[in-house]
């Protein structure tokens, strides 16, 4: 069975990772956005019959090393040719109350 591993970027306790304050005083928080997107993707993929694993279900930030350990465990269990890992991030480019000039998006992959 093909397995899709979903990683939601950052946790509630990760400093930064948010927008400048909006007019109403709230901020866009990357951890909330990423978890909402991952939950929606997981629901749709499961409905299509895929085996889906959310790598980081916790609200707190999980270290990169622990994320890699969890991913590698699933890859050993299901086989490298049967797994796809997607990490969802928003890459907010705010600095306190000002936006920085970053633009665009990125996708990272490995050989194979």
Give a label for each model feature:
Residues 1-68, 101-103:
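Active-site histidine-acidic residue metal-binding/catalytic motifs
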Residues 10-12, 90-93:
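Short glycine-rich anion-binding loops that position phosphate/pyrophosphate groups of nucleotides
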Residues 94-111:
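Active-site-adjacent substrate-recognition loops and nearby beta-strands
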Residues 44-47, 89, 110-112:
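Polar, enzyme-active/binding microenvironments
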Residues 64-80, 102, 109:
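Mature extracellular/periplasmic domains of secretome proteins
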Residues 1, 80-82:
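A general structural motif
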């Amino acid at each position: 069975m093909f397995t899709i591993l979903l990683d939601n970027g950052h946790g509630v306790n990760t400093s930064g990772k948010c927008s400048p304050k909006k007019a109403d005083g709230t901020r866009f928080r990357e951890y909330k956005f990423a978890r909402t997107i991952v939950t929606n993707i997981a629901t749709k993929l499961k409905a299509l019959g895929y085996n889906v694993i959310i790598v980081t279900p916790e609200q707190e930030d999980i270290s990169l090393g622990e994320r890699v350990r969890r991913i590698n465990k699933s890859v050993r269990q299901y086989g490298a040719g049967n797994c796809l890992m997607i990490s969802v991030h928003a890459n907010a480019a705010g600095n306190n109350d000002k936006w920085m000039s970053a633009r665009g998006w990125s996708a990272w992959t490995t050989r194979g």
